[in-house]
Amino acid sequence: MKVTVVGAGAVGASCAEYIAIKNFASQVVILDIKDGFAEGKAMDLMQTASLNNFDTKIVGTTNDYSKTADSDICVITSGIPRKPGMTREELIGINAGIVKEVSAKLLEKSPNTIIIVVSNPMDTMTYLVHKTTGIQKNRIIGMGGALDSARFKYRLAEALDAPISDVDGMVIGGHSDKGMVPLISKATRNSIKVSNFLSAERLDKVREDTKVGGATLTKLLGTSAWYAPGAAVSSLVQSIACNHMKIFPCSALLDGEYGLHDLCIGVPVILGRNGIEKIIELDLDSADLNHLTESAEGVSKTNSLLGL
């Protein structure tokens, strides 16, 4: 199993590290345009192999796509990160050109690869890859919902004062502060609805804290977060590589599901060796369905900025 990560920044390096430590891939290639940067990250990570007990070979390269040939899975993290006060949508102009070029070069060397998009605005970048590459829709996946759901579960566990392993919850919708739809109505602690433990006011705070989770970290760090995004991506990669058939909320191209057409947005999917094996249609209450529809309108508006 060969995995390529494009972008040796904090998220890309974190992703490569988690994949290596989980020890399911034979090789991870890190590619970056900055001379020597990916090579340095790869060397540093390889020097942790004996300490972290993994056998994955990590290779770095400066913009040499021949090193990525025959990758089973490619992760695109390249692009400019958010700065404090920036929205994900403000990144669109620069990152669109980068993602379009990178996806084309990856497919030239690995025509059967599965692509996971991390670059922001993530739903629009995922849709851009669909529109510009023309490959099967099951082979293009946007990462956002898996990360947003992890942040949701963190906030739920915090509010419940419970072990995070007791908590289950999911975020669907767009990967943006306004577009996220944390499914409070379906969130549970050991299969018991969280509404049995928390007041409506407390649940509203959990919802809002989840939606601004990325912005909160950007303000604290001065740049985008990297540990949780890297972990989220590695979980998607592992489910695909090992055919685990796990369910994650991911940005997928919809064709009538949830009443939505021709856009990418976060919904629960089953991930296996073919990428998206199935899109799951949840039985949403009217409020959550309305929020998802509103989120889709926001994603479509962002798509239109690129003429998509």
Place the predicted regions along the sequence by residue.
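Rossmann-like NAD(P)-binding element
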Residues: L51-I114
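Extreme N-terminal starter segment of soluble prokaryotic enzymes
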Residues: M1-V3
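C-terminal substrate-binding/catalytic lobe of Rossmann-fold NAD(P)-dependent dehydrogenases
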Residues: T133-R139, D148-L308
